């Protein structure tokens, strides 16, 4: 930032002595911005009291204020801006009552902050850096030539102090304004996601990409010119080595190097932080989509069915043919010819027949839960069933039991999108994840 020749106590005493104060409510600030806009259209930069009253009348109309007292309130607003040193009033004895008003540097700075400085332009930044490069190159050449104190003051110190430093401060101000702009974009994105995240996805993507592009353009422009600027500053610094009389130049060069480092490092840091925020927003959207799919799908389906007559819709689904695993070739290889008769215990049984009998038995046992409307804890029932059979049969038994249990009913927790806990069902590490079936 700019250097101050006064100390803190001196500045505090000066502000107290001159009774400095700033109070700008929204109405006053809008009035000041309107005056600045009107001032930009005037070649002489002067405004009469009638012009200011007309501007205030427009502001009052925008804020939906009464029209009866507009003249009195306009006079109070003008006097308030003059008192706060935002406007200068010039009166003449020859033309009494026809005062001329001009914006003060403070008024121009405040209005410029809200109107023009917020307009980021890569071309403007490139021109500023080009001017800085020319000034530093000329100052470096003058420093290497050497000369008396007047030469150093005029050809080295003055360009660095009143041109390069001010442009660095302007770039720094632009970066700080972009910080506020990013915060505003974040508030806009938060508002969009709060209202309706499905409709806001495209708008959020646009805001994220625009801000990312602006930050990248700014950083690319700074990095392209940063090395050359540092090289010229080092040339000037080398020329002042060993010369105590040029300490003021060396101190200024050191401050400029610190400003340039801060400007370039800010650009990369801002990009890194924005990338993190971009990922956070996308993660939030993905999480919202997943939660909506699991939690609100049933509710939206019911609403769609209920409102079908008002808003007809069509359901498209895939009905592909099932793929059957045919093992005839393997069975033919195992079909060895045998002689004699087998005992009944060794007679071959088709797996499908065995499975049907087991399924019928399990279905009969599970019907008790449905008849008595008792909750069916699938994990507990699986543990009890699997304890009756050897380990080799656990997988087949668990599959049959789960199929039969699912046919009986559903779990209320499934509609709420809640994730079930894993439960152990045997002593060999097998687990199942299922809610208690409570609706048949």
Curated annotation (Swiss-Prot):
GO MF term set: calcium ion binding
Keyword Protease set for record: no
GO biological process: cell division; chromosome condensation; chromosome segregation; DNA replication
Compartments, as annotated in UniProt: Cytoplasm, Nucleoid
UniProt keyword list: Calcium, Cell cycle, Cell division, Chromosome partition, Cytoplasm, DNA condensation
Family of the protein in this entry: Belongs to the MukF family.
Summary of subunit composition and partner proteins: Interacts, and probably forms a ternary complex, with MukE and MukB via its C-terminal region. The complex formation is stimulated by calcium or magnesium. It is required for an interaction between MukE and MukB.
Alphabetical list of HAMAP family matching this protein: MukF (MF_01803)
Protein name per Swiss-Prot or TrEMBL: Chromosome partition protein MukF
Organism: Edwardsiella ictaluri (strain 93-146)
Gene from which this protein is expressed: mukF
